Each structure stands twice: as structure tokens, then as C-alpha cells.
């Protein structure tokens, strides 16, 4: 690795750093060496995380080397090198004036980010460096605990108290192993993230939570989320000593909000009422136990849990405190307009004093609350919700966080802290009240509307000052979007002598930024409150987005100021048919409000962008939402970003109003040069920082490029542009004519695509960083799990290790068809029918501890894990099947799933949601009229979707088949092939047939065609240990001479190699290198797991976009194993709407042969040798390979059709995506 010397420190960097990276590392060293704070902004994609890690760890090593050199020189006492000065030994600490005399004085590095998933990314970067420090990651019990009983607790605070109870009683064997095993090399040495820590703890049966706390003592660098540092209670809980440490806040644009929220609270009537209910329960139990003269079983000495060490009088006093607090809050008079009242921060002490909560009593109250919560931890029941009591305990700690000696309301420190707070009391909008309590202790406020007590901190500097008071050596805040840096430093209220606004590492031809003040019709674009919902503005914005989507290739991101604005805009565009036109250009994916469905939505977007022949996709998101931060939209996933307005906070929100008033007051008190922003400046910056976060999605690395559209006339003002990041400002251009925007953007992308290298194909998609995303979305290969995508040999077949005896042909692709004819273990039973498949897919959940990639939207109903296959290669037996209807049901299930795949590919996200809801309603109500009314608008308007409507016929309930036929003819002009017997339920059709005597006719055991029957010699071959195929060739003209079901599998011989090579050559020409790679990966996966669903999903996405690719789908049958042939042919027919060539299903000429029971007993008979059997079998297979069905000719064949490469996915005349 290159070694760079900066400020006298040698830094090992994984590659030669760019100039901006060297400047960044120099500023970091300046903070560390001079013991000062720094604010460092460096755009996303410039490698700031790597620079931070390498620089800080190199500086620590430099200090350690200096101490070592000084100690050696002192011991030598100048005898060895009398002429050399002491400073020449690298006494860096002495030279810098640092009083670091021993190794334990070397500062620890505390690296904080917003979420653990972001920290995992940082740890992965650390593994890529040459540094191997002692590492520790701090997490909560919710993330780290492996005790089954503790993990069952629903809330975090219950886990905490139950854990403490078990630790105190030494009843947790995981905790008991911590001291013994914490020094083991496997646990102490490697760089472990949260997942690794849990896996190692489970393996060694040691508690990961307490193990991480042990490792913290000796760690060189400690990783933790923000709140562990900013929240005083969390600092105490994790015993974090900040004295002399270097604290780094990565993604620091969130620090301001986190500082304020960690020191604020909202106490609702529901919190107090639930707390009182819990205390009532404990008081009642203790009273009954006292009246009976013996302890309650829950509190007895024999109970494994320690009893409640509280007197009845103390519990009653605690209840009285809560009632008085509730009464004091309800006694505050509010104005009639429900606007609430605001008091100064010191009012909180007056209010709490009425309930006898003071600095003097807080200790006893907190102990009592803690005892009750810990006593009830682990107990089940509706009356043991201790969340209210826990919240009250946290609130008391926030209010009385300052020591009594310096925190009294009259002291200077207390006054300074209270200036940052406001008390706001307002009506409870949620009306979350418990039932009225009827005892004498019950509050009278329950009959009135409750009030919420809010205690809000408006200065992030309050938390920053607390960190400085703890003795932090240096505080470094860094992010990609801190602009304007000067105002950010003012908000923190502590000095930052070192500041940096780094440029980007990209060139000017890689970024295009334009302000679009007017739409194509000349109407002004504005998201101002009075214009955002006007018809003129919404219509013009919709037309502008549609035109931009035509010229931006691949992925396009559109950010709205808020969810209501996005939803209202979509509603307007759907009503005016603008949304349908956008869908025709690029399908729309909308960011959901809920956390659970976000991963699926973003995975669907990634998959659509990566699909071969796709024109891309559009993702509609919200500023400050999940997609605006932490997601990687690099390369084709995000070639353009559109910001539709300035996302100002809600202007009339009480918290926003009070924040602006507070800032104006502070600025006024400090005079014209006061170190505070004005309220209006802060308000504007909230919008600009959200915009900057959205802009940061487009350029993610050195070779990336993209365009930014600022679609609001207010961006044309100089003050708005001044708030943009420094690396963006030089590229901004304001356009007066919308046509010039389209012209310049089209030219930009033409030049970029010619000059920039094509992005490398990825095995996995960008990771979803952040806690909102439970699992990581993968693309462009959404059809495989993360575990398989990481295996190199899946994507490079030539690297796969061959077992001895496997073919080692020169062409690695020729080995793909080997062993396809072997039978796997049958799959477990699956749900039957379309509705059952839909319901089954919604109920499925991933297995814990296994990496899973969420399927894209087109595959959410597809893949299901099969049982592991048993060893193959054993002798195969003829099995007598007594229930021939089961394979039919399995095929029907496969058709249902694949039909859902096709529908989800063709419909938009909103329309697919409507479709699935209609299915659920039809399943529950059996209302065919409602179903038909829903399906008509979805499938009838577009002729390309008529085949989907007709394909739905097979899943309509029998008594509705005829009606559906009539609806189909009415909507599409074509029927579905209805016959009267289709109206008879399957069960009735499958009833046993009675012979003339009234007895049940014998059930046929085996079905074979006439041609197949001619190949069998029952007297010589069947069950006699001899060849199953007759040595005589099939007669000319016999149907058996053509490939039948299960006969098209090529072997690894020359003919098989040529067939495979020809097929893959045609696939590469038609689908491109990326599509062919996907096909190869799917084929390899099919060979390993025998999951036809997965390979069909990939195949459908690749070969059904264009009719000329249909032959590739049909010719794929050469790789399909025999037991999948019938399902594959039916699927081909369903997907293409054409009969499967050369694979006609069994017709009337088939005759059923009942195998006599005597044939199930084997008798050893002399037979031909193994070589003879092999030769005869191979000759038969070769005859099948020689005679190909029409339409499946290999490379160069006429039936395959010419291979055509897809055109560019953009341009003014871009074609509609899909079929």
C-alpha cells in the first residue's frame, strides 16, 4: 500500500489518494495534533470514511512509536548514540507538547454514526486497510442479547431490566462465561461488527453485550451510534469515559436534530395513565399479600426472581406523585383555540415541584421506579405495560441531568442550560386515554381532554457543551452535506478552528445542474404553500417530469418536499392521464411511508433498472425520507435527480415556531455580531440541507455521472443557490426556456456515455444503509440470495472446482448441462391456485440468521426454499403413483406464481396493489362482478395486456368460468377457450368412475404414450435389472421419434457442447453480456438447487420483453430436467401466448397401462453388461438430440430468428418499456 507522509505522520493508504483526500487527511491531522475541533465537509464518493480511519489510526501509531523511541533512548542514557539528539528518535508527543508518557495515555478513537448499519459499512472499510487495531462495537441488548427469555421481551426497557435481574442472580450462563472467554484469541483479536459479535457469542456461548463492554476497556477504536454519546443516560449505562478521547461524528448532518431530541421529551396523558395502572396492580398485590400475613408467591424468597423491596407506604407515595403530576399538568389553562401555552424552561421545575419531584427527591423516585420495572420484567399480561413508568424515569433524568450543586435554577450553569429549553403544554390530539378509574385515588382529569407536556431543547450546543465538559480531546464532525459550514458551526455553539469544504473528485463533464423555473407550457414551477396544489403548477410539473424522463437514461429519482405533496401530485396526474404517460416511459416506484415495505420497493426499482432492454425506472421519494439518505444510487441506478421544491419545515408547527423565536431571542441578546443564526436563516437552511442530501444521491464515485434538475423558480435566486454544496455551485445554470434544458441534457448524456467507462456489472445491488432497512436490497441480480451472489464461482463457471471424473472440456459452458437428467428429492407441498399462492407468499417470513435478499417486485411471490437434496447417483426405481392429480396441482401452483410475476412486471406499483386487493376481496366474498369491474381498467385498455386477462381464466373459480369468458370477449374481442366441463369443480371431475356393477373402477397406475410403450419389453427389461430402453430404434414416422417430454437434455458430449455453445452465443448476441451473465448464473443455480421457479423468473425477465427473443425461451428446454419439462412447456405457452413448438402435450392417442403388482418385486436375472446398457441408452438419447423440434435450431439456424441488440434506453422517441 502507498505510504503518504502528512504533517510528519506516515499514513498507509490502500491506493494513491486524490488531492482532495490528501487535503482532508491533513485537516484531520491538524485537529488531532493541535487538540482542536473540526468541521469537515467532503462530498459523497470522495472516500472520507477511509481517510478518517487511516489518518486517526496512523496518528495513534505515530504516538506509540514516539513513546517507544523515547523509552529506548532513556534506558540507553545516551551511551549508545551520544551524538544523536533525543528528538531524532521520533519523540512526537514531546514535540507537540503532549503530556503522553505511557501507552495507556494514547487517546482512544470513538467513531459514531447514526445507525449500526452505517457502522457496519465503516468496519468493512477498516478491513480494507492495513491497520489492525483492537476494535469494539457497542450495541443495545435488543441487538446483542442471545438469551432466549430476554429476547422474547417486546420492549427494550423490559429486556434491560430482565437482563439485569438475571445477571444479578447469576442465572444467565452466557453472562457467566464472559470473564473466562473474553480473552480468547478468536473473540478478542479480529475486527467484529454487530453480526459477527452475535455469531461469535452464539458459537462460544458467551454474552455479546457484556463481551463488547469488556472489549471496550482495551479497544483502540470504539464504534457506537450517536445517541450513546449525546444521551447522558446512555453514556452512564455503557460507562463511556470521554476524557482524552477523539470523538468522530460521521454523517454529522443529523447531529443537530439528534442533540435536540436526546434532551427533549413529550409526556402524554397515556404515559401517566399506563404508569398509574401498573402501580395500582403492584399496590393491590402487595396489599393482598400483607392482609394474608404471608408473602405473595411472586415476592416469596423461594421465587427465582428477587422480591420487591418496597413498603406499601412507598408504593402509595409513588402513586400520589404521579397523580399530583397529572393534576398539575391538567390544571394549566389553555386558550380556546387549542394552540397551547408556552412557558420558559425554568417552569418545568415549578411544575415538578408541585408533584414533589425535586433535586432532593429524584434519587428515591428513580430507585422506586427502577425496582418496580425490574420486578415486573418478564411477566406477561395486559396490565404489565411498564413503558409509561420507564418514560417517566427517563424524563426525570433529563430534567434533573445537571448536578444539584451547579444545576439549581438560580445558578449560572442552570440558567445557561435553561435558556435552551421551552415548556409547551397543548391538548392531546391523539385522545389516548385509558378507562376512567373509579377508586378514591382516581384523577378527575380523566373526564376532560388530556394535555401533553413538552419540554423542548432548541440548542444542539447544549449537548455539545456536555461532551466538551467531559474532557474530549478533539471533536470532528464530518459529512457530505454540511453546507453552509459556517452556519453549522454557529448552531453547535462550540469553537471549530478547523473547517473544510472539499471539492468533488469528478470532472466538470460528469455533472450537469440546471434550475428549471418553468415547465414546457411556460407555467411557473413552484412548491410554495399557496401554489403547490394549483392545477396549473401540477400540470406543468407533470409535463416537465415526463419530458425529462425521455432524455435521462436508466434510473431517475424525483424528490418531493413531503408525503402529502407527493400523494396529491400523483393523484392529480392519475386523474389527468399524466401518470400513465410517465409509466409508459419509465415505471413509477413510490417510496412507502411504512418501514416494512421499503426494502421490497427499492429492490423492485433496482431490478427494473437492471433488467435487459429496460428503459429504466422512476423512483418517487421524499426529502428527509428513507431514500434521501444512506442509499446508494450509483451508476445506472441514479442517472438523474429531480428536486421538485424546497422542503421547508411546517411553518405553523409549534416546535418550528418556538425554535425560530428562540434563535431570534438569542441573536438579539448577543447584538448584531451574536454567535447565533436568526430564525429565518435556520428555517431556510433546513430546506437547503434536505435538498443537498437529495442531490448527493446522484454522484457516488469517481467514474459516476449524472444530472440534477432543480424544478422550482425559487432556486433561481442567488441566496438559494448559495446554500448548495460548494462542489455543485460552479455547475449551476439557470434556464429560461424548457426546450434548452432538454437539448443540453440530451447532449450531456451523449457525451458522458461516449467518454465515461461503462459501469462494471455487479453481483449484488447497492446496500440499503440505515435501520429502516431490515435487510439489504440487491440488484441487478434480484433472483439470488446474497450468499449465492457473493460466491464467485456462481458467476464464473470456469472457477468452480470439479470433482474427480467430471468433464474438463475446454469450453466451461459445456459442463452446465451435466447431471440435469438426475431426479431430485420431491419438493414439499405448495399452496394450490392463484389466491392460495398470493396468500402464502404474504405469510412467508425469512429464517433468522440467514442472509436473504428481498426479491424485486416482480418476484415477491416466486421463490421458495426447497429441502436440501439428498445424494444423487443412486439406482432409480419405477414408482407406482396412486394419486396422479398431485403433479397437476403443483403445475397449477407454478403457473399461478409465474402469472403473478408477469402481472407485476406489466402493472405499476399502485395498479398491482389494486389487483392484489381485488384478488383478496374475491377470495373472501366470491363477488365476481366486483372482480371483473377491477380487472377491466387494469388489462383491457392496453392491447399488450389482453393476454394477461385471458391468462387469468385458469384461476377463476369454476362457477364463474362462463361469465369470465363473456367478459373477456366483451373487453378484448377474444375468448378464453371456455368449455362446459370447465364449470364443474375439479373435485367432482376427479371422482372415481363406477363400472356397470357399481364398483369403483381400478385406478390406473402408469401413463405412457404408445411410442414410449414400444420401447419397453416387459418380459425382458422391466424390473429385471436390464436396460429399460429397447435396443431397437423407433419406427420411422412414429411420434416417439420426435423429442417427447423429458427428452431434450443434452449430455456433455460433442453434440451437447455444440448445442449449448450455440445457444449461449445466440443469447449473448440477443441479450448482451450482462443478460447472458444473468442467464448463466441462473442456469448454474438451477443445476445446484433444482429450483425451476428461480430460473424461470430470470428467463421470463430476459426473453419476454421482445417477441424476437421468444425462441431463446423455447430453446432453453435443452437444460430443463425431465421432471420439469411439462411445467416448462406450459409456462412457455403462458408467457408467450404461443403453443410450445415440438412439445405437444399428451393427446388422445395415449393409452393407460396398469402395471401388474407382481412387477414391483425384483428377481435377479441375467442381463447385458453395464457397457451394453450404457451404449443402448446413449444411442437413444443421441437420436433425440439429432432430431430437434422446429423452432429450436441452434446457432445459425433459421428458426432461431435473427439476433437483435436492444437500442438505447432513452431519447425523445424512446419506446415504451415492457412487452
UniProtKB/Swiss-Prot annotation:
GO biological process: DNA repair; DNA strand displacement; mitotic telomere maintenance via semi-conservative replication; negative regulation of DNA recombination; negative regulation of t-circle formation; negative regulation of telomere maintenance in response to DNA damage; positive regulation of telomere capping; positive regulation of telomere maintenance
Helicase ATP-binding domain ranges (all copies): 7-296
Main location (coarse class): nucleus
Impact reported for residue 897 to E: In DKCB5; severe form consistent with Hoyeraal-Hreidarsson syndrome
Annotated effect of mutating residue 48 to R: Abolishes ATPase activity
UniProt-reported outcome of changing residue 964 to L: In DKCB5; severe form consistent with Hoyeraal-Hreidarsson syndrome
SUPFAM superfamilies: P-loop containing nucleoside triphosphate hydrolases (SSF52540)
Annotated [4Fe-4S] cluster binding sites: 145, 163, 172, 207
Biased composition (Low complexity): 757-766, 1200-1219
Disorder named in the UniProt entry: Dyskeratosis congenita, autosomal recessive, 5: A form of dyskeratosis congenita, a rare multisystem disorder caused by defective telomere maintenance. It is characterized by progressive bone marrow failure, and the clinical triad of reticulated skin hyperpigmentation, nail dystrophy, and mucosal leukoplakia. Common but variable features include premature graying, aplastic anemia, low platelets, osteoporosis, pulmonary fibrosis, and liver fibrosis among others. Early mortality is often associated with bone marrow failure, infections, fatal pulmonary complications, or malignancy. Dyskeratosis congenita, autosomal dominant, 4: A rare multisystem disorder caused by defective telomere maintenance. It is characterized by progressive bone marrow failure, and the clinical triad of reticulated skin hyperpigmentation, nail dystrophy, and mucosal leukoplakia. Common but variable features include premature graying, aplastic anemia, low platelets, osteoporosis, pulmonary fibrosis, and liver fibrosis among others. Early mortality is often associated with bone marrow failure, infections, fatal pulmonary complications, or malignancy.
This protein's domain notes: The PIP-box (PCNA interacting peptide) motif mediates the interaction with PCNA and localization to replication foci.
Protein's name according to its UniProt entry: Regulator of telomere elongation helicase 1
Source species: Homo sapiens
Lineage of origin: Eukaryota, Metazoa, Chordata, Craniata, Vertebrata
Gene that encodes the chain: RTEL1
Amino acid at each position: 500500500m502507498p505510504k503518504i507522509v502528512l504533517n510528519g505522520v506516515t499514513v498507509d493508504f490502500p491506493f494513491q489518494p486524490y488531492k482532495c483526500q490528501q487535503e482532508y487527511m491533513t485537516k484531520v491531522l491538524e485537529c488531532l495534533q493541535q487538540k482542536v475541533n473540526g468541521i469537515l465537509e467532503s462530498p459523497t464518493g470522495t472516500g472520507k470514511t477511509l481517510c478518517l480511519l487511516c489518518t486517526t489510526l496512523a496518528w495513534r501509531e505515530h504516538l506509540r512509536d514516539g513513546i517507544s523511541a523515547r523509552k529506548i533512548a532513556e534506558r540507553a542514557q545516551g551511551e549508545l548514540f551520544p551524538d544523536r539528539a533525543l528528538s531524532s528518535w521520533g519523540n512526537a508527543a514531546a514535540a507537540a507538547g503532549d503530556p503522553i508518557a505511557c501507552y495507556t495515555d494514547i487517546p482512544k478513537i470513538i467513531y459514531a454514526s447514526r445507525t449500526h448499519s452505517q457502522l457496519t459499512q465503516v468496519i468493512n472499510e477498516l478491513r480494507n486497510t492495513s491497520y489492525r487495531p483492537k476494535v469494539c462495537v457497542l450495541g443495545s441488548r435488543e441487538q446483542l442479547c442471545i438469551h432466549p427469555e430476554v429476547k422474547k421481551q417486546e420492549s427494550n426497557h423490559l429486556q434491560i431490566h430482565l437482563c439485569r435481574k438475571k445477571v444479578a442472580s447469576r442465572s444467565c450462563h452466557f453472562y457467566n462465561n464472559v470473564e473466562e472467554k473474553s480473552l480468547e484469541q478468536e473473540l478478542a483479536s479480529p475486527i467484529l461488527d454487530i453480526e459477527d459479535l452475535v455469531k461469535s457469542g452464539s458459537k462460544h456461548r458467551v454474552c455479546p453485550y457484556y463481551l463488547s463492554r469488556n472489549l471496550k476497556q482495551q479497544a483502540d477504536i470504539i464504534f457506537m451510534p450517536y445517541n450513546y454519546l449525546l444521551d447522558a443516560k446512555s453514556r452512564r449505562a455503557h460507562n463511556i469515559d470521554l476524557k482524552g478521547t477523539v470523538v468522530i461524528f460521521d454523517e454529522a448532518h443529523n447531529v443537530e436534530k439528534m442533540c435536540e431530541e436526546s434532551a427533549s421529551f413529550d409526556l402524554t396523558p397515556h404515559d401517566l395513565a399506563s404508569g398509574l395502572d401498573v402501580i395500582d396492580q403492584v399496590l393491590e398485590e402487595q396489599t393482598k399479600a400483607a392482609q394474608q400475613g404471608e408473602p405473595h408467591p411472586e415476592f416469596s424468597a423461594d421465587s427465582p426472581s428477587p422480591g420487591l423491596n418496597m413498603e406499601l407506604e412507598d408504593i402509595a407515595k409513588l402513586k400520589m406523585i404521579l397523580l399530583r403530576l397529572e393534576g398539575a399538568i391538567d390544571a394549566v389553562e389553555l386558550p380556546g383555540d387549542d394552540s397551547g401555552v408556552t412557558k420558559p424552561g425554568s417552569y418545568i421545575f415549578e411544575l415538578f415541584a408541585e408533584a414533589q419531584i425535586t433535586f432532593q427527591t429524584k434519587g428515591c423516585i428513580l430507585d422506586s421506579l427502577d425496582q418496580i420495572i425490574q420486578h415486573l420484567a418478564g411477566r406477561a399480561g395486559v396490565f404489565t405495560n411498564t413503558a409509561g413508568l420507564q418514560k417517566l424515569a427517563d424524563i426525570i433524568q433529563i430534567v434533573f441531568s445537571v448536578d444539584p450543586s451547579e444545576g439549581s435554577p438560580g445558578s449560572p450553569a442552570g440558567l445557561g442550560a435553561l435558556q435552551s429549553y421551552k415548556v409547551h403544554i397543548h391538548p392531546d390530539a391523539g385522545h389516548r386515554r385509558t378507562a376512567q378509574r373509579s377508586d378514591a385515588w382516581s384523577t378527575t382529569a380523566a373526564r376532560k381532554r388530556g394535555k401533553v407536556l413538552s419540554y423542548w431543547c432548541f440548542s444542539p450546543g447544549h449537548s455539545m457543551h456536555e461532551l466538551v465538559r467531559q474532557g474530549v480531546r478533539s471533536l470532528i464532525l464530518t459529512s457530505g452535506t454540511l453546507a453552509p459550514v459556517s452556519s453549522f458551526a454557529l448552531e453547535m455553539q462550540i469553537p471549530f478552528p478547523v473547517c473544510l469544504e472539499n471539492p468533488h473528485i469528478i470532472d466538470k463533464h460528469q455533472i450537469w445542474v440546471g434550475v428549471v423555473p418553468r415547465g414546457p407550457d411556460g407555467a411557473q414551477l413552484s412548491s410554495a404553500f399557496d401554489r403547490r396544489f394549483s392545477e396549473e403548477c401540477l400540470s406543468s410539473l407533470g409535463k416537465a417530469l415526463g419530458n425529462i424522463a425521455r432524455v435521462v437514461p436508466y434510473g431517475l429519482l424525483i424528490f418531493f418536499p413531503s408525503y402529502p405533496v407527493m400523494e396529491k401530485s400523483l393523484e392529480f396526474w392519475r386523474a389527468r392521464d399524466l401518470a400513465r404517460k410517465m409509466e409508459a416511459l419509465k415505471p413509477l416506484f413510490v417510496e412507502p411511508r411504512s418501514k416494512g415495505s421499503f426494502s421490497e420497493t427499492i429492490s423492485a426499482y433496482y431490478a427494473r433498472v437492471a433488467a435487459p432492454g429496460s428503459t429504466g425506472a422512476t423512483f418517487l421519494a421524499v426529502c428527509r425520507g428513507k431514500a434521501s439518505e444512506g442509499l446508494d444510487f450509483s451508476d445506472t441506478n441514479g442517472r438523474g435527480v429531480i428536486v421538485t421544491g424546497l422542503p421547508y419545515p411546517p411553518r405553523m408547527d409549534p416546535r418550528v415556531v418556538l425554535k425560530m423565536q428562540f434563535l431570534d431571542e438569542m441573536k438579539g441578546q448577543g447584538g448584531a455580531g451574536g454567535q447565533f443564526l436568526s430564525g429565518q436563516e435556520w428555517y431556510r437552511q433546513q430546506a437547503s440541507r434536505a435538498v443537498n442530501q437529495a442531490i448527493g444521491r446522484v454522484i457516488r464515485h469517481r467514474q459516476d455521472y449524472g444530472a440534477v434538475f432543480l424544478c422550482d423558480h425559487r432556486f433561481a435566486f442567488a441566496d438559494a443557490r448559495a446554500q448548495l454544496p460548494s462542489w455543485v455551485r460552479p455547475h449551476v445554470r439557470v434556464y429560461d426556456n424548457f426546450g434548452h434544458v432538454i437539448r443540453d441534457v440530451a447532449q450531456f448524456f451523449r457525451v458522458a456515455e461516449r467518454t465515461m467507462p461503462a459501469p462494471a456489472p455487479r453481483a449484488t445491488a447497492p446496500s440499503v444503509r440505515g435501520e429502516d432497512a431490515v435487510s439489504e436490497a440487491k440488484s441487478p441480480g434480484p433472483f439470488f440470495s446474497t450468499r449465492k451472489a457473493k460466491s464467485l464461482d456462481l458467476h464464473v463457471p470456469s472457477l468452480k472446482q470439479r470433482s474427480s471424473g467430471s468433464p474438463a472440456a475446454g469450453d466451461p459452458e459445456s459442463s452446465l448441462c451435466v447431471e440435469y437428467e438426475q431426479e431430485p428429492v420431491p419438493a414439499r407441498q405448495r399452496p394450490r391456485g392463484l389466491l392460495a399462492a398470493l396468500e402464502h407468499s404474504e405469510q412467508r417470513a425469512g429464517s433468522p440468521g440467514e442472509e436473504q435478499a428481498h426479491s424485486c417486485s416482480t418476484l415477491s411471490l416466486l421463490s421458495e426454499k426447497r429441502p436440501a437434496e439428498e445424494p444423487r447417483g443412486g439406482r432409480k426405481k419405477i414408482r407406482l403413483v396412486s394419486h396422479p392429480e398431485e403433479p397437476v396441482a403443483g403445475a397449477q401452483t407454478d403457473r399461478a406464481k409465474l402469472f403473478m410475476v408477469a402481472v407485476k412486471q406489466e402493472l405499476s406499483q399502485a395498479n398491482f396493489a389494486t389487483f392484489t386487493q381485488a384478488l383478496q376481496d374475491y377470495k373472501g366474498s366470491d363477488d365476481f362482478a366486483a372482480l371483473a369491474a377491477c380487472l377491466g381498467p387494469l388489462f383491457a385498455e392496453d392491447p399488450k395486456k389482453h393476454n394477461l386477462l385471458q391468462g387469468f381464466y385458469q384461476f377463476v373459480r369454476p362457477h364463474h368460468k362462463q361469465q369470465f369468458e363473456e367478459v373477456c370477449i366483451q373487453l378484448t374481442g377474444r375468448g378464453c377457450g371456455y368449455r362446459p366441463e370447465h364449470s364443474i369443480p375439479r373435485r367432482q371431475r376427479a371422482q372415481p368412475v363406477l363400472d356397470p356393477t357399481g364398483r369403483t373402477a381400478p385406478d390406473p397406475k402408469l401413463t405412457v404414450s404408445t411410442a414410449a410403450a414400444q420401447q419397453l419389453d416387459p418380459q425382458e427389461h422391466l424390473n429385471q435389472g436390464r436396460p429399460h430402453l429397447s435396443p431397437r430404434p423407433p419406427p420411422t414416422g412414429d411420434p416417439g421419434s420426435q423429442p417427447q417430454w423429458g427428452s431434450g437434455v443434452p449430455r456433455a458430449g460433442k453434440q451437447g457442447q455444440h448445442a449449448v455453445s450455440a445457444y449461449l452465443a445466440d443469447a449473448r448476441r440477443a441479450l448482451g453480456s450482462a443478460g447472458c451473465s444473468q442467464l448463466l448464473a441462473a442456469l448454474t443455480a438451477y443445476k445446484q438447487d433444482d429450483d425451476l421457479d428461480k430460473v424461470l423468473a430470470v428467463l421470463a425477465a430476459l426473453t419476454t420483453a421482445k417477441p424476437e427473443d421468444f425462441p431463446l425461451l423455447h430453446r432453453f428446454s435443452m437444460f430443463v430436467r425431465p421432471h420439469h419439462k411439462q411445467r416448462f412447456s406450459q409456462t412457455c405457452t403462458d408467457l408467450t401466448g404461443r403453443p410450445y413448438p415440438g412439445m405437444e402435450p399428451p393427446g388422445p392417442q395415449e393409452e393407460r397401462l396398469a402395471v401388474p403388482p407382481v412387477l414391483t418385486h425384483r428377481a435377479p436375472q441375467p442381463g447385458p453388461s453395464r457397457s451394453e446398457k450404457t451404449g443402448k441408452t446413449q444411442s437413444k438419447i443421441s437420436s433425440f438430440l439429432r432430431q430437434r423440434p422446429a423452432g429450436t435450431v441452434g446457432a445459425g439456424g433459421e428458426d432461431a430468428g435473427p439476433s437483435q441488440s436492444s437500442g438505447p434506453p432513452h431519447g425523445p422517441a424512446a419506446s415504451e418499456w415492457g412487452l
